[in-house]
Curated annotation (Swiss-Prot):
It is found in: Membrane. This is Sodium-dependent neutral amino acid transporter B(0)AT1. Residues 1-41, 87-119, 214-221, 290-304, 435-456, 512-531, 603-634 are cytoplasmic. The chain crosses the membrane at residues 42-62, 66-86, 120-140, 193-213, 222-242, 269-289, 305-325, 414-434, 457-477, 491-511, 532-552, 582-602. It comes from Rattus norvegicus. One of its GO terms (cellular component) is brush border membrane. Glycans are attached at residues 158, 182, 258, 354, 368. Interacts in a tissue-specific manner with ACE2 in small intestine and with CLTRN in the kidney. Interacts with CLTRN; this interaction is required for trafficking of SLC6A19 to the plasma membrane and for its catalytic activation in kidneys. Interacts with ACE2; this interaction is required for trafficking of SLC6A19 to the plasma membrane and for its catalytic activation in intestine. Interacts with ANPEP; the interaction positively regulates its amino acid transporter activity. It comes from the Eukaryota. It is a multi-pass membrane protein. The gene is Slc6a19. Transporter that mediates resorption of neutral amino acids across the apical membrane of renal and intestinal epithelial cells. This uptake is sodium-dependent and chloride-independent. Requires CLTRN in kidney or ACE2 in intestine for cell surface expression and amino acid transporter activity. The keyword Phosphoprotein applies. PROSITE patterns: NA_NEUROTRAN_SYMP_1, NA_NEUROTRAN_SYMP_3. Residues 63-65, 141-192, 243-268, 326-413, 478-490, 553-581 are extracellular.
Length: 634
C-alpha cells in the first residue's frame, strides 16, 4: 500500500486535535448553523446531487451507448469514482467544520486556491443554471392554457396559412426557438433583451434568494418539497407513461444492451464524466453542508445512501423518459404510416378505409404491379420505429421539445405540462441551493466582506450581481452563451479540482491521519475498499478521464449548433465553428478556475520566501506559523 506523505510543516497548528474537536463543536453551537435533523441534511445533499442532468442527460447517454450496456461502466465507475470522492468530501468537511476555502487552506496554506477554484465554478454554473429555471418558469406559466400554446403553429399575417418557419419545422420547435428564445443565427448577433425571459429570470433569482436568505436555516425547510416532489411527479409520469401506446417500445429500446459498446473508450469516458457530474463533486457545496453536522455523524453511511439514491434516480428517470419517448415515437410512426396510406389512396383513387396499416404493403405491391408508372411518381416516407426511437436528444432539447411534443398528444395536456415543469423547477432549485452555498461560505472564509455584514446581505448581493450578469442569457444569442458555459465551466475545472482534493487529503494531509479522524467520528477505520480507491483507483480514473478529454478537445474544432430558418437542411440545426474571440472566453471560463490552484500556491510560496528571505529555513518557519485559514500570523 502506498504510504507517501509530502512534508507539511505547521499542520498540527492549523488542524484542531481530535480531543479539541468536541469542545469546538460545543463552543460553536450558538454561532455556527446546524441541521435541525438528519432528514434535512440528507434531503439537501440528495437535492444538490440529483439535478436536471439525471433527467435529461443520463437517458441520452444510455441511448447513445448501447442502452443497458451503458449501465455497466456507469455502475462500475459510480462505485470506484463517485462514492469514494463523495465520502472524502463529506468526511473532510465534517472533520474540519469549514467551507471549501477553510478546509483546503487548513490542510496547507498553498491549497487555498483549490477552494477558490470551487467557488469560481459554483458561481459560473449557478450563473447559467438559474437561467434554465427561468425557462422552466416561462413554460410553467404558459401551461395554464387549453390548448397549449406550443400544440399548433400560429397563422401568418394574411391568415392564409401557418408561419413559414413553423410550417417548415414544428409547433414545439417554433415555440421554443422563436416564441421563447427568439434566437439569433449566430453567437455574435447578440440582439436585444427578451423581456419575458427577463421577468422569469427575475422571478427565479427572487425565489432562490428567499430560499437561501439565511443559509441552511431556510434551505433546510425548502428541501422537504424541492427534494421529494420530483420523485412523486416521476412516479406519476411513469404510471401514466405505461398506459400510453408504445411506452414499452421506448423502455425496451433503452435497456436492450449492445455489448459491443463496452469496447468503445468513449462509452467509459462518458460514463465516468456522468458519474462525476451527477454527484455535484468539487463544487464545495457538499463540504459546506457536511460541516454543519455533528462530529460523530456517520458520514460513511451518508455517502453510500446518497450514492445509491443518485444512481437509482438516474435509472428511474431514464425509464420514465423513455416510456414517454416510446409513446412519442409510436405516435410519429403512426402519423408516418397514415401519411403514406393517404398518399397511396389519393394516387390511385382508392376507397377510404380499404387501406390500413396491416394491409398497406400488400396494396403497395398491387398498385405497383397494376400501374408502375403512376406508382413511381408517388413519394413515400420511410417509417421505422427504431429510427424515431434512436433520435438522440439531451438537455434543453429533451425538456422543451421532445417532452412538450409528447405532452400535447396526451389527454388533459395542461395538467401534465404543469406537473412536468414543477418537477424540473424543483430539481433545478434544489441544485442551486448547493451552488449558492459553494459561493457564500468561501466568501465568508476569505473575509472579503466586513464581518458585521449579515448573511442575508451577502446572499442578496451575490444574487443581485449574478442576476445582472445573467442578462446576457436573455439576449437573442442567450442560448448559445448558455451552451458555451455549460460545456466548459462545469467540465475540466471540476475534474482538476476533484483530483487536487483527493491528492491533498491522501498525500498532503495524510491518509493515515484521515483514517484516524474517520475512526474518531464514526467508530471504525475505513475498510480496504476506501483505502485502495482513495490512494490509487479514483485518482487514476480522474487522470485517465482528463487525458482522454484533453486529447479529444485539443484535436477538434470548437463547434456549436445554430437555429437558422435559411439553412438548406432546416429544421436540422446547423453546426458552425465558434468565432475566434470565443476561444478567449473558453480560456477564461475553463482556464481561470484551473489556473487559480497553481497560481495561488506559487504566490503563497514566493510571499513566504520573501518574508523570510534572511532565514535559511524561512519557508518552513513561515508555513509552520500559518493560521487556520491559511494566512500568516503576525
Amino acid at each position: 500500500m502506498v504510504r507517501l506523505v509530502l512534508p507539511n510543516p505547521g499542520l498540527e497548528d492549523r488542524i484542531p486535535s481530535l480531543d479539541e474537536l468536541e469542545v469546538i463543536e460545543k463552543e460553536e453551537a450558538s454561532s455556527r448553523p446546524k441541521w435541525d435533523n438528519k432528514a434535512q441534511y440528507m434531503l439537501t445533499c440528495v437535492g444538490f446531487c440529483v439535478g436536471l442532468g439525471n433527467v435529461w442527460r443520463f437517458p441520452y447517454l444510455c441511448q447513445s451507448h448501447g442502452g443497458g450496456a451503458f449501465m455497466i461502466p456507469f455502475l462500475i465507475l459510480l462505485v470506484l469514482e463517485g462514492i469514494p470522492l463523495l465520502h472524502l468530501e463529506f468526511a473532510i468537511g465534517q472533520r474540519l467544520r469549514k467551507g471549501s476555502v477553510g478546509v483546503w487552506s487548513s490542510i496547507h496554506p498553498a491549497l487555498k486556491g483549490v477552494g477558490i477554484a470551487s467557488m469560481f465554478v459554483s458561481f459560473m454554473v449557478g450563473l447559467y443554471y438559474n437561467t434554465i429555471i427561468a425557462w422552466v418558469m416561462w413554460y410553467f406559466f404558459n401551461s395554464f392554457q387549453e390548448p397549449l400554446p406550443w400544440s399548433e403553429c400560429p397563422l401568418n399575417q394574411n391568415q392564409t396559412g401557418y408561419v413559414e418557419e413553423c410550417a417548415k419545422s414544428s409547433s414545439v420547435d417554433y415555440f421554443w426557438y422563436r416564441e421563447t428564445l427568439n434566437i439569433s443565427t449566430s453567437i455574435s448577433d447578440s440582439g436585444s433583451i427578451q423581456w419575458w425571459i427577463l421577468l422569469c429570470l427575475t422571478c427565479a433569482w427572487s425565489v432562490l434568494y428567499v430560499c437561501t436568505i439565511r443559509g441552511i436555516e431556510t434551505t433546510g425547510k425548502a428541501v422537504y418539497i424541492t427534494s421529494t416532489l420530483p420523485y412523486v411527479v416521476l412516479t406519476i409520469f411513469l404510471i401514466r407513461g405505461l398506459t400510453l401506446k408504445g411506452a414499452t417500445n421506448g423502455i425496451v429500446f433503452l435497456f436492450t444492451p449492445n455489448i459491443t459498446e463496452l469496447s468503445n473508450p468513449n462509452t467509459w469516458l462518458d460514463a465516468g464524466a456522468q458519474v462525476f457530474y451527477s454527484f455535484s463533486l468539487a463544487f464545495g457545496g457538499l463540504i459546506s453542508f457536511s460541516s454543519y453536522n455533528s462530529v460523530h455523524n456517520n458520514c460513511e453511511m451518508d455517502s453510500v445512501i446518497v450514492s445509491i439514491i443518485n444512481g437509482f434516480t438516474s435509472v428511474y428517470a431514464a425509464t420514465v423518459v423513455y416510456s414517454i419517448i416510446g409513446f412519442r415515437a409510436t405516435e410519429r410512426f403512426d402519423d408516418c404510416v397514415n401519411t403514406n396510406i393517404l398518399t397511396l389512396i389519393n394516387g390511385f383513387d382508392l376507397p377510404e378505409g380499404n387501406v390500413t396499416a396491416e394491409n398497406f404493403e400488400a396494396y403497395q405491391h398491387w398498385c405497383n404491379a397494376t400501374n408502375p408508372e403512376a406508382y413511381a411518381q408517388l413519394t413515400f416516407q420511410t417509417c421505422d420505429i427504431n429510427t424515431f426511437l434512436s433520435e438522440g436528444v439531451e438537455g434543453t432539447g429533451l425538456a422543451f421539445i421532445v417532452f412538450t411534443e409528447a405532452i400535447t398528444k396526451m389527454p388533459v395536456s395542461p395538467l401534465w405540462s404543469v406537473l412536468f415543469f414543477i418537477m424540473l423547477f424543483c430539481l433545478g432549485l434544489s441544485s442551486m441551493f448547493g451552488n449558492m452555498e459553494g459561493v457564500v461560505v468561501p466568501l465568508q472564509d476569505l473575509n472579503i466582506t466586513p464581518k458585521k455584514w449579515p448573511k442575508e446581505l451577502l446572499t442578496g448581493l451575490i444574487c443581485l450581481g449574478t442576476y445582472l450578469i445573467a442578462f446576457i442569457f436573455t439576449l437573442n444569442s442567450g442560448q448559445y452563451w448558455l451552451s458555451l458555459l455549460d460545456s466548459y465551466a462545469g467540465s475540466i475545472p471540476l475534474l482538476i479540482i476533484a483530483f487536487c482534493e483527493m491528492f491533498a487529503v491522501v498525500y498532503v494531509y495524510g491518509v493515515d491521519r484521515f483514517n484516524k479522524d474517520i475512526e474518531f467520528m464514526i467508530g471504525h477505520k475505513p475498510n480496504i475498499f476506501w483505502q485502495v480507491t482513495w490512494r490509487v483507483v479514483s485518482p487514476l480514473i480522474m487522470l485517465v478521464i482528463f487525458l482522454f478529454f484533453f486529447v479529444i478537445e485539443v484535436n477538434k474544432q470548437l463547434m456549436y449548433s445554430v437555429w437558422d430558418p435559411d439553412y438548406e437542411e432546416f429544421p436540422k440545426s446547423q453546426k458552425v465553428p465558434y468565432p475566434d474571440w470565443v476561444y478567449a472566453v473558453v480560456v477564461i471560463v475553463a482556464g481561470v478556475p484551473c489556473l487559480t490552484i497553481p497560481c495561488f500556491a506559487i504566490y503563497k510560496l514566493i510571499r513566504n520566501y520573501c518574508q523570510k528571505s534572511g532565514d535559511q529555513h524561512g519557508l518552513v518557519n513561515a508555513l509552520s506559523t500559518a493560521s487556520v485559514n491559511g494566512d500568516l500570523k503576525n
